[in-house]
Regions:
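Conserved tyrosine-mediated DNA breakage-rejoining catalytic core shared by Y-recombinases
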Residues: 99, 103, 120-123, 154-201
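Basic, Lys/Arg- and aromatic-enriched nucleic-acid-binding interface segment
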Residues: 68, 72-76, 87, 93-149, ...
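Catalytic-site neighborhood detector that most strongly recognizes the C-terminal catalytic loop/helix
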Residues: 115, 173-177, 274-299
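Short, polar N-cap/turn motifs at the start of nucleic acid-interacting alpha helices
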Residues: 159-166, 246, 265-284
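C-terminal catalytic core of Y-nucleophile DNA break-rejoin enzymes
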Residues: 178-200, 209-235
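DNA/chromatin major-groove-contacting recognition/catalytic segments
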Residues: 127, 187, 283-318
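Basic/aromatic-enriched alpha-helical hairpins
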Residues: 7-65, 81-83, 235-238
């Protein structure tokens, strides 16, 4: 990259994608917004961008029929690329252009999470094992832990604690929104003894720093590379008599979160185990929290319609 001339938006995306890969992030965050940008913006120097044209681009995505949440994700990726470019090039001084032009759309967070009951999740896991053992194991770990594929891909053999009555995985934190030095941290996530036994057998003979979960060809699952599982997972969902356009791998994560909420697990514990925030849990799963809160509260309701004779109160004689 020629540093003697101003960076273009396209070059800013290239820089951002390399930075994401270096930090263990998802390069899709750079690829996705790039596909929605016209050549006139991609080829333009970052330093010449204006708020009006960026706002016009953002609003054009809505006109094309993209959901507000999708538009917000696209503009967030563009903003991140532009911020990184400005950090590398002191000649870029127009940060206000994207702070104003790429402001977030209001009320764009409308959760459309697919929640599956336990029987359906088990059916998916069985179908996955029937399709491909390596895929089945990855999907079972996803179903039990509720972790993202990006986290599962970074699990190492040493992260498995299979011995003892309370087996667990030391789950890598997501790189999402974290500083570079945070992505190597792990948090213990409980797993079932049966799953621990399978993982221990699969990991036998591998080095401690070797990937715990491998694809059928022996390679690591590539987070951010949907081709590694997309078509196979669609086939699994169809085999489980479900709609692959509705049920995605994320449904296992959403179902895990709701499963914990419905057995009265404190929200802070749920958020920690699923590597998210209390705020996000409350915002995304508010309906399920409200339903469960209602069920708990009803147990303590006083029914004043019961006959007085049914109580322990003895009326006084005249």
């Amino acid at each position: 990259m020629d540093e003697s001339r101003p960076l273009t938006v396209s070059e800013a995306f290239t820089l951002y994608e390399k930075d994401l890969v270096a930090r263990g992030g998802n390069p899709y965050n750079a690829e996705h917004p790039r596909t929605h940008l016209p050549a006139v913006i991609l080829n333009k120097p970052v330093s010449l961008l204006g708020a009006t044209e960026l706002r016009r681009w953002r609003d054009s995505l809505l006109a094309k029929g993209l959901a507000p949440g999708t538009v917000n994700r696209a503009k967030t990726g563009l903003r991140a690329a532009l911020e990184l470019a400005a950090a590398h090039d002191p000649r870029i001084t127009n940060q206000r252009a994207w702070k104003v032009g790429l402001s977030a759309l209001p009320d764009a967070h409308r959760a459309r999470n697919v929640i599956l009951d336990d029987a359906t999740v088990r059916r998916i896991v069985r179908a996955a094992y029937d399709h491909d053992r390596a895929l089945g194991l990855m999907i079972e770990v996803a179903a039990v832990t509720g972790a993202r594929l990006s986290q599962l891909a970074r699990l190492e053999v040493a992260d498995l604690q299979a011995d003892g009555p309370e087996p667990r995985l030391l789950m890598p934190l997501s790189a999402k929104g974290r500083a570079r030095n945070k992505r190597h941290e792990r948090r213990p996530v409980p797993i079932t003894p049966a799953l621990a036994a399978v993982l221990k057998q699969e990991a036998q003979g591998r080095a401690p720093d070797a990937p715990l979960l491998l694809r059928a060809n022996g390679e690591r699952w590539g987070h951010g590379r949907r081709r590694h599982h997309r078509n196979d997972f669609r086939a699994v969902i169809e085999a489980a008599a479900l709609d692959p356009d509705v049920v995605t791998l994320s449904a296992l994560r959403h179902s895990s979160i709701v499963r914990m909420l419905l057995v009265n697990t404190p929200i802070r514990i749920v958020s920690t185990l699923h590597d998210t925030s209390v705020k996000m849990i409350e915002r995304t799963y508010s309906r399920h929290i409200a339903e469960h809160t209602d069920a708990l509260a009803r147990r303590a309701l006083l029914d004043v319609s019961q006959r007085l004779a049914d109580s322990n109160v003895v009326p006084m004689k005249a």
